[in-house]
Amino acid sequence: MFNLSSSHCYLLYVKPCDMRKSFDSLSGIVSGELGREPTGGEVFVFLHKRRSHIKLLHWERDGFSLYYKRLEKGTFTPPVPAEDGSILWPELVLMLEGIKAEKIVRKPRYCVPEKR
């Protein structure tokens, strides 16, 4: 079941990725190159060299989910990630929908402070 939302942390792998890779190989990239734990609950975003394919790797409570999309025409335009490689949920959605977000300015909104 598709279980992604704004409550997840999304990390963009900035190098081109071979789309023949699946769960184990992508998990190896996450742990080996990104230094992250693949089962940590974050969603890892991988793009093909031509940016016409995208994969999202996500650990759910009982195993990995891999979401894969191939465009028949056009390319994905990835957002510029933060220093830690993260992108926001709205940026991911816009990228998947083919909307360039380079000149969009996000206006400040109230956020409920996190409880610790």
For every predicted segment, state its role.
Residues 1-116:
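Polybasic/polar functional segments that serve as interface/processing modules
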